[in-house]
């Protein structure tokens, strides 16, 4: 607080004797910017999430993927990966590429998740437009799914999905981008399915020290 007062004085915003430190502290407290509040925020941001079984927590996300060719003229379109990752096992129970990041894509993927594995206890997503749909929130409520949403622009609170996206880009999408001919959306999804089944789900994960498929199956 003293440093802030010194800055205000040097910039001639206030005279040194006109602003008490206690007054400034009160304003910070009301605005949620006190040291105590900021320390609490820091702990919340980097708090480690612990789960003990599969589908206790599932994380959903969209991210920009490689280009695909679309239509009779083979126009290049950016594909978007939309998927769900199980926190406990790092298994991907549902994931595919779409041409749009919208409610229709979310609805399709969400249905596939439920049909294949049933509802998770908690579903963690960001504040993307698709996740704000009233019908999506109503569906989660009707199914007894606790819907948790990360704060906007706080990617560090979603470390699991960020790490998966990095793995997806480095191991799979980089290979796709290196090809001479753009794939169709169906081809891209077929390759993704094979990569998940034969590579990602079988490789030992550095944090769990188990392969995602094995850890998911045993829990």
Predicted region positions:
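A short, amphipathic alpha-helix used for macromolecular contacts
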Residues: 1-20, 63-70
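DNA-binding alpha-helical recognition surfaces that contact promoter or target DNA
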Residues: 6, 22, 26, 190
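Mobile-element integrase/transposase regions
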Residues: 22, 26-83, 91-92, 103-112, ...
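Residues immediately flanking
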Residues: 62, 87, 127
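Short small-residue beta-strand/loop micro-motif enriched in glycine and branched aliphatics
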Residues: 90-95, 148-150
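A short acidic/small-residue loop/turn micro-motif
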Residues: 97-102
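RNase H-like two-metal-ion nuclease catalytic core shared by retroviral integrases
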Residues: 123-127, 131-143, 147-173, 183-189, ...
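Active-site-proximal acidic segments at structured loop/helix or strand boundaries
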Residues: 171-219
């Amino acid at each position: 607080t003293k440093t802030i007062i010194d800055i205000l004085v040097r910039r001639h915003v206030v005279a040194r004797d006109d602003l008490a430190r206690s007054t400034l502290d009160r304003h910070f407290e009301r605005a949620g910017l006190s040291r105590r509040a900021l320390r609490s925020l820091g702990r919340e941001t980097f708090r480690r999430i612990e789960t003990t079984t599969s589908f206790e927590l599932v994380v959903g996300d969209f991210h920009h993927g490689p280009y695909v060719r679309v239509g009779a003229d083979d126009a290049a379109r950016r594909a978007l990966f939309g998927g769900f990752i199980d926190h406990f096992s790092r298994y991907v129970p549902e994931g595919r590429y779409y041409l749009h990041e919208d409610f229709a894509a979310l609805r399709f993927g969400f249905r596939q998740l439920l049909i294949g594995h049933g509802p998770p206890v908690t579903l963690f997503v960001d504040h993307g437009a698709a996740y704000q749909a009233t019908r999506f929130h109503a569906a989660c409520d009707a199914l007894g799914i606790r819907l948790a949403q990360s704060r906007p622009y706080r990617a560090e609170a979603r470390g699991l999905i960020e790490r998966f996206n990095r793995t997806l880009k480095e191991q799979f999408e980089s290979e796709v981008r290196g090809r001479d001919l753009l794939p169709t959306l169906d081809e891209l999804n077929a390759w993704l399915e094979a990569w998940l089944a034969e590579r990602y789900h079988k490789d030992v994960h550095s944090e769990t020290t188990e392969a995602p498929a094995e850890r998911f199956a045993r829990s």
